């Protein structure tokens, strides 16, 4: 019986990426194959709208005239304060990042016709298979957006302390300032209340993606906002260990040369359920958020549908000995 009496090397191209493997027989009907494959980082551009508050505003009136929105007002304020121009959309780049080791067992059920084979095995690699991040050109807008939300949040906290002061629960010096620069502080109750009135009528600024339900069962708009680094990111994750089952067909590549062969493998890589799409704040877009619209929503629905990843690979084989 032939055990490890010859060795094949292959270049692989297909839905698992670009890679290589080596194979050797283990008996008359079985071949052991191992290799590695990676997917080149093909970039896909996506755009996210930026808005103030949870309700989307129209930029035009009934007559088609451009009107000033809450976003326009806040963008002008932020540009005046920070010098950064805030755009009404943020561009992100999505790319595949997966690469896997693979171990396969090919079984040739027909001893007189070794063109057909059945394959079982597994892929193993990082759980992150894709990611997304904002482009450099979006950084000024994201930094300004983060500054606005910081001002908004601190104003809400300061306003609560002013209300306690109004009720006589705390002393004037215990009022939490909106911010301080050296010894200068914005802690005047009147100033804080005026700022609160303006900002609370607008809401926080962010990129609305869809609806999500909190722990109390209340539905609200999920607004993606930049992290502490002023960036927005997302990752697509699956199980690291991914079983595989498939079939294949192969034959000689050149009519009179047994050293060169080609084989096509068709099968399924089992991801262990729908992939998770995790943003930088820990939100799972595939499970926690629904009703995502536009191109981003299309991508999310496609990714959610791939509980099993279709494998279509072509192997160009060279017999070393």
Segments from the language model and where they lie:
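Extracellular/periplasm-exposed beta-strand and loop segments of Gram-negative cell-envelope proteins
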Residues: 1, 6-10, 41-99, 127-240, ...
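Short loop/turn motifs that connect adjacent beta-strands in outer-membrane beta-barrel proteins
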Residues: 1-6, 29, 110-116, 131, ...
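Long, hydrophobic N-terminal alpha-helical segment
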Residues: 6-41, 91
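Membrane-embedded beta-strand positions of outer-membrane beta-barrel proteins
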Residues: 9-11, 22, 32-34, 105, ...
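Transmembrane beta-strands of outer-membrane beta-barrel pores
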Residues: 13-17, 36-42, 122-128, 251, ...
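Ordered, amphipathic secondary-structure segments that act as subunit-interaction surfaces
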Residues: 95-128
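A C-terminal functional module that forms or caps the active site or interfaces directly
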Residues: 260-264, 273-277
């Amino acid at each position: 019986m032939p055990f490890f009496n010859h060795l094949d090397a292959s270049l692989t191209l297909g839905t698992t990426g670009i890679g290589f493997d080596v194979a050797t027989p283990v008996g008359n009907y079985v071949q052991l194959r191992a290799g590695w494959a990676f997917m080149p980082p093909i970039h896909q551009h996506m755009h996210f709208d930026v808005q103030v508050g949870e309700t989307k505003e129209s930029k035009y009136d009934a007559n088609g005239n451009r009107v000033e929105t809450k976003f326009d007002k806040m963008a002008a304020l932020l540009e005046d304060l920070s010098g950064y121009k805030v755009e009404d959309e943020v561009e992100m780049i999505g790319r595949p990042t997966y690469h896997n080791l693979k171990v396969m067992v090919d079984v040739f059920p027909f001893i007189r016709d070794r063109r057909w084979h059945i394959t079982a095995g597994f892929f193993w690699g990082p759980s992150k298979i894709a990611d997304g991040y904002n482009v450099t050109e979006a950084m000024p807008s994201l930094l300004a957006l983060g500054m606005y939300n910081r001002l908004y949040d601190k104003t809400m906290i300061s306003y609560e302390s002013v209300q306690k002061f109004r009720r006589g629960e705390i002393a004037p010096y215990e009022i939490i300032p909106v911010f301080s620069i050296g010894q200068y502080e914005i802690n005047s109750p009147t100033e804080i209340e005026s700022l609160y009135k303006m900002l609370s009528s607008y809401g926080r600024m962010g990129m609305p993606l869809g609806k999500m339900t909190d722990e109390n069962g209340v539905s609200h708009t999920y607004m993606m906002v930049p992290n502490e680094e002023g960036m927005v990111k997302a990752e697509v994750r699956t199980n690291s260990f991914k079983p595989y089952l498939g079939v294949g067909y192969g034959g000689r590549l050149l009519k009179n040369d047994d050293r060169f062969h080609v084989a096509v493998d068709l099968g399924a890589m089992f991801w262990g359920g729908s992939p998770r799409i995790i943003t930088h704040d820990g939100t799972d877009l595939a499970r926690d958020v629904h009703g995502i619209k536009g191109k981003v929503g299309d991508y999310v629905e496609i990714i959610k549908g791939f509980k099993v990843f279709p494998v279509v690979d072509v192997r160009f084989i060279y017999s070393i000995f």
